[in-house]
A protein has these predicted regions:
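Structural recognition of an alpha-helix C-terminal capping motif at a helix-to-coil junction
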Residues: 50-57, 70-82
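Intrinsic, short, N-terminal disordered tails of RNA polymerase sigma-factor systems
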Residues: 1-7, 11
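Short alpha-helix-to-loop micro-motif enriched in aromatics/charged/Gly
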Residues: 64-69
Length: 88
């Protein structure tokens, strides 16, 4: 059984995929600080912020065809990790 946090993220992702701008704003506010801090472990803070912004924008722009087989949380952190390594 999924926990409340995961269920909330599933609902949030579904809303984003339907084009709900408020849901995307919520996703952005929820994940931006954590993802920036995580990305900053690999690159300078300014670069981490840009990587996170690009990642979240990519989610929005590709929302209609986006398929996430893992959790949203895992997907976002892996995306930032990979983009940070490419940036190095």
């Amino acid at each position: 059984m999924k926990g409340t946090y995961q269920s909330d993220n599933d609902f949030l992702l579904s809303a984003v995929q339907r084009g709900d701008q408020k849901a995307f704003d919520t996703l952005f506010r929820r994940y931006y600080p954590m993802l920036c801090a995580y990305g900053h472990r690999f690159v300078e803070l300014e670069d981490a912020e840009e990587i996170v912004e690009d990642s979240l924008l990519w989610i929005w722009e590709n929302r209609e065809t986006l398929v996430i087989e893992s959790s949203l949380n895992s997907y976002l952190f892996k995306m930032v990790y990979r983009l940070s390594l490419i940036h190095i």
